[in-house]
A protein has these predicted regions:
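Residues at structural and domain junctions
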Residues: 4, 15-16, 81, 113, ...
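A generic structural signal for alpha->beta connector loops
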Residues: 37-38, 82, 133-136
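ATP-dependent small-molecule kinase phosphotransfer cores
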Residues: 1-71, 75-77
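Hydrophobic/aromatic beta-strand patches that form the interior of the parallel beta-sheet core
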Residues: 41, 84-86, 137-139
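A glycine- and Lys/Arg-enriched "phosphate-lid" helix/loop adjacent to the NTP-binding pocket
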Residues: 47-125
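NTP-dependent small-molecule kinase module
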Residues: 93-168
């Protein structure tokens, strides 16, 4: 409806659509749980906008976008700021290898973004910048050039969550 590829919609417009969707979800689904002290876990939350939409911009324009996005979602819309963001960092080459294995194991095909090597590299670059800008906690999924075990990554994630819960 808005174009043939993701770049047909500018980062600010696309981010606004997703932010409004998050706002509606917050108001309808999890606001009361959050207000009563419930623990809310989210996969991608505002971080997805920072990475995918931030990738449409370069240099200073990207940092200005990060600032705008933070203001839009947390100040103007009043969405709760996360106490902790865990970014699972993985080199693109290893991610691509895992996607090929998944395709082979399940008989499925990678989506249009997963097949775009340039897009994957751009997303990782933007995620690294966003992690620095927003203060995300980086969890490397690779050690000494090899994929860490699920259990090893889990233990690190659990330790970060446990530490955060002790602080709040």
């Amino acid at each position: 409806e808005f174009g043939e590829n993701p770049n047909d919609v500018n980062a600010y417009a696309a981010s606004t659509f997703y932010a409004v969707d998050r706002f509606a979800s917050y108001q309808r689904v999890w606001k009361n749980d959050y207000a009563s002290g419930g623990l809310i876990l989210s996969d991608r939350y505002t971080t997805s906008n920072a990475v995918h939409q931030g990738g449409k911009l370069e240099g200073k324009a990207r940092e200005e976008f990060f600032s705008w996005l933070y203001d839009l979602e947390f100040n103007r819309m009043g969405l709760p700021k996360p106490d902790l963001v865990l970014w699972l960092d993985m080199p693109v080459e290893i991610a691509e290898s895992l996607m090929r294995k998944r395709e082979s194991d399940t008989g499925t095909k990678a989506d249009i973004h997963e097949r775009d090597d340039g897009y994957l590299h751009k997303c990782r670059e933007v995620a690294q910048q966003a992690a620095d800008y927003f203060g995300w906690t980086r969890v490397s999924c690779v050690r000494d050039g090899r994929l860490r075990s699920i259990e090893d990554i889990h233990e690190e994630l659990y330790a970060h969550v446990q530490s955060c819960l002790e602080e709040i």
